[in-house]
């Protein structure tokens, strides 16, 4: 057989330069077809929450961190999602911890207290003259304590970066028959700064 000859005819379709959307008789109908579906089945003149809520609240296969999704007890049990208004339970042995950014407040302008199962953090600036006006800042943040935390053991410390770190050790679960497998000693943090 001579060089460059093949025993059978061979054509390479890749050598043909062809635009399938231009040359095909289906090209004009392919991109225009809606496949029998409306692009937006709902009325677009309605306010967005009414037409977006069904799409956002449909069942998802995993956890979805959105405030619009209703969470029932089955979703809580199935996916380990805490009920609304509750903090996720801490791991056994680890303290419950929350950080609040208070970088624009001085320690003496902050107050942390526990009341009715909540930690309440509040801060207030006195009025300051800034850029042609008087500025006064104040805030109050309430954080619900988990059931595993005793409100009496809550303490707060302020980091140099302006983060208020609120911590509390977990209450050990009840142990029947006086068998104690838990360490009753709590670690002491000597570097904490109390905010009043």
Curated annotation (Swiss-Prot):
Asymmetric dimethylarginine PTM sites in chain numbering: 71, 78
Q: What post-translational changes are documented for it?
A: Phosphorylated.
Q: Which GO terms describe its cellular component?
A: cytoplasm; cytosol; nucleoplasm; nucleus; protein folding chaperone complex
Q: Which sequence positions carry the modification called Phosphoserine?
A: 24, 57
Intracellular or extracellular location(s): Cytoplasm; Nucleus
**TM region positions:** none
Q: What region holds the sHSP domain? A: 74-185
| Pfam family of the protein (one) | HSP20
InterPro entries given for it? A-crystallin/Hsp20_dom (IPR002068), Alpha-crystallin/sHSP_animal (IPR001436), HSP20-like_chaperone (IPR008978), HSPB8 (IPR043254), HspB8_ACD (IPR042790)
Which stretches does UniProt call biased (Polar residues)? 178-196
Instruction: Report residue spans for region: Disordered.
Output: 1-28, 176-196
Q: Which residues carry this modification: Phosphothreonine?
A: 63
This molecule's function is given as: Involved in the chaperone-assisted selective autophagy (CASA), a crucial process for protein quality control, particularly in mechanical strained cells and tissues such as muscle. Displays temperature-dependent chaperone activity.
Q: How does it assemble?
A: Monomer. Forms a ternary complex with BAG3 and HSPA1A. Component of the chaperone-assisted selective autophagy (CASA) complex consisting of BAG3, HSPA8/HSC70, HSPB8 and STUB1/CHIP. Interacts with HSPB1. Interacts with DNAJB6. Interacts with BAG3.
Which family does the record claim for this protein? Answer: Belongs to the small heat shock protein (HSP20) family.
Name of protein? Heat shock protein beta-8
């Amino acid at each position: 057989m001579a060089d460059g000859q093949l025993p059978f005819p061979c054509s390479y379709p890749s050598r043909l330069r062809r635009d399938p959307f231009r040359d095909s008789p289906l090209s004009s109908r392919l991109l225009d077809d809606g496949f029998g579906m409306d692009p937006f089945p709902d009325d677009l003149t309605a306010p967005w929450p009414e037409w977006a809520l069904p799409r956002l609240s449909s069942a998802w296969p995993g956890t979805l961190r959105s405030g619009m999704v209703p969470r029932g007890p089955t979703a809580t049990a199935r996916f380990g999602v805490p009920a609304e208004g509750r903090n996720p339970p801490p791991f056994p042995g680890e303290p419950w911890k929350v950080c609040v950014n208070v970088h624009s407040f001085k320690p003496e302008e902050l107050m942390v207290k526990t009341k009715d199962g909540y930690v309440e953090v509040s801060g207030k600036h006195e009025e300051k003259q800034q850029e042609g006006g008087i500025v006064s800042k104040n805030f109050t943040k309430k954080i619900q304590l988990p059931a595993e935390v005793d409100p009496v053991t809550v303490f707060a410390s302020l980091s140099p970066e302006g983060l208020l770190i609120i911590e509390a050790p977990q209450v050990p679960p009840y142990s029947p028959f006086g068998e104690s497998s838990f360490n009753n000693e709590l670690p002491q943090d000597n570097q904490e700064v109390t905010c009043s």
